[in-house]
Amino acid sequence: HFCQDNALPEGFDTARLDKLFAQTNPGQAVDVPTGVGFCMYIRRDALADVGLFDVESFGKGYGEENDFCQRAAKAGWRNLHLLDTFVRHAGGVSFQAGKSPREQAAMETLRRMHPDYEREVHAFIGVDPARSARQMVDLARLRESGTPVVLAVLHDRAGGTLRHVAELAKHLQGHAVFFTL
């Protein structure tokens, strides 16, 4: 699920998923409005051009990487999400609904310094340009698992078809993967 903390698929560790991403989406990347601080690669020439993280305005831990990415984009650099790489962020609290006072203050600072930041992030989330790459990895994962895949194409009229397919999927849970259209 996009923008959520997700458990690893059964039978897959980070190394196995990373290999699958590398095989499925080699060399692919999409532009993003911001990086994710726990896992960012910054070129030295970009750092020299844009400057260091603004610890004065943000402190350490919240918002400084977002500010850096916004400054980099304004200076003509690209922020890229590599689609051939998988990194797991375990134990983070970034996905929790409630934000700490430090996180809230960092967001206010970002809004003040980069008024278009939230709009750009929400537009990126709405378009989700990495979705097809994730779906391709999911298909590759299913193929690799050897588990049968069932696609049920259903009509939207009344009757017992939907119920029957739901019962069948429940009965075969663990033995087959069901998708419905």
Range-by-range predicted roles:
Residues 59-62, 162:
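Short-chain dehydrogenase/reductase
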Residues 1-51, 59, 66, 75, ...:
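Acidic/His-rich active-site region of diverse nucleotide-sugar glycosyltransferases
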Residues 57, 86, 156-158:
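Short, glycine/serine-rich, charged loops/turns that create anion-binding
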Residues 120-136:
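Short linear, low-complexity motifs centered on an aromatic residue
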Residues 135-181:
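N-terminal subdomain of nucleotide-sugar transferases
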Residues 66-73, 166, 170:
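Short, hydrophobic alpha-helix immediately C-terminal to the catalytic nucleophile
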Residues 109-120:
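Negatively charged linear elements and acidic catalytic determinants
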